């Protein structure tokens, strides 16, 4: 059996914030029905992610995002990965964010039964290792389509 050909990874992420990005994308999708973000900047000191939404979340919804994130972290969900060929990708997983030259064998990352997506980044072993999640700020930029771009700036500690 020959070894699978995999894409290389050319950047170093801060694993707690990067894993929190996965949880946050899934939380936003569940709360607002939006797609995973296509624009994220993840760092140790602060991270920011944008989503396209039909309306700006209320202060109560923003507080709920932070609360849900900290509940998921406290739940100590296991984080695992597995290499899967494209023919065996779990149902519902979208591959449209992958680069054109992505290999046929993909590294899938599972966070408990809460989230699964292809990713070659670094992650913690369980959500408890993230520590805590704090929203530093949010912003809303209206778009001509009637919705807008919602940004969350966050920190993990």
Listing of model-derived features with the role each one plays in the protein:
Residues 1-157:
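Active-/binding-site microenvironments in catalytic and ligand-binding cores
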